[in-house]
Amino acid sequence: MKSFLDSKITSPLVHRLDSEKTLNFKKYQKKFEDLYKNELSSSSFKKSFFNIFTDVNACPYCNRNFINPIYKAKQLGKDYKKWSPDIEHFYPKSIYPFLSLSISNLLPSCTFCNKIKSNYDTYETCKSPYEMKDNDISFKFLPLDNQKRLISVESKNNIKNIELFNLDDLYHDVHSNYVNNIFLNINKNPIENRKYLKKFFSLSLDTQDKLYKKKFCNYYQERDFNKQPLSKMTKDLFFHIKENELK
């Protein structure tokens, strides 16, 4: 996500605390809230906004759900708003109204993550998807009975994205079958898969991309993780298999 913007927010500018609720602050706060409500919440703005993120097909918060907008003429009373993902404020507009209009604070989001996050103040605890790196969050696959795996999601530097979006439970409860099926297929043909790994790391990056996508039906490079759900988890699973299952 960080490739979409050249600038970043280094300070939330104004934090709405009780001690800061002066008349001037309230006046400008109301102006920003009205401007967002009347202009940036419109269907035309939503369409322009999502056009910026044409290659972002998966929610940048959870990487679990597709977020592609669908544009059609009005049908059974539905308009663009009903056919698009949510626009999420990383710093909540209820707390940082001056950032409600900042493109650096806006992200496409699945409805699930938007509702979970709600008005939670992310300033000191979470990291924006614009700033996230591949190793900020990692997936571990712990052995259980019957050759199954427990999916564990871990964070670097104590960022709270995992706790906020409940990623640990969601990934394990919802996507365990996906992971366990990959393990099952790998263990059926260990010799063939060892040959695959040996060949894989001797190839060019472009060829690796093609070979990886053919086998795992997902993207190998971090820059492409937003193109398809579960891409980050699948990449971590691939390296777990390389280092632990097919030595």
Region roles according to the model:
Residues 116-170:
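Domain-level detector of nuclease and nuclease-like folds
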Residues 5, 156-247:
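C-terminal, charged low-complexity interaction regions
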Residues 1-47:
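N-terminal accessory alpha/beta regions
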Residues 63-105, 119-123, 128-134:
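Histidine-centered nuclease catalytic patch
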Residues 59-62, 110-113:
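Short cysteine-rich clusters marking metal-coordination/redox-active sites
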Residues 52-56, 102-106:
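Short metal-coordination and nucleic-acid-contact micro-motifs, chiefly zinc-binding Cys/His arrays
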Residues 42-50, 94-100:
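Short, intrinsically disordered, charge-biased short linear motifs at domain edges
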Residues 25-28, 33-36, 61, 66, ...:
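Aromatic side chains
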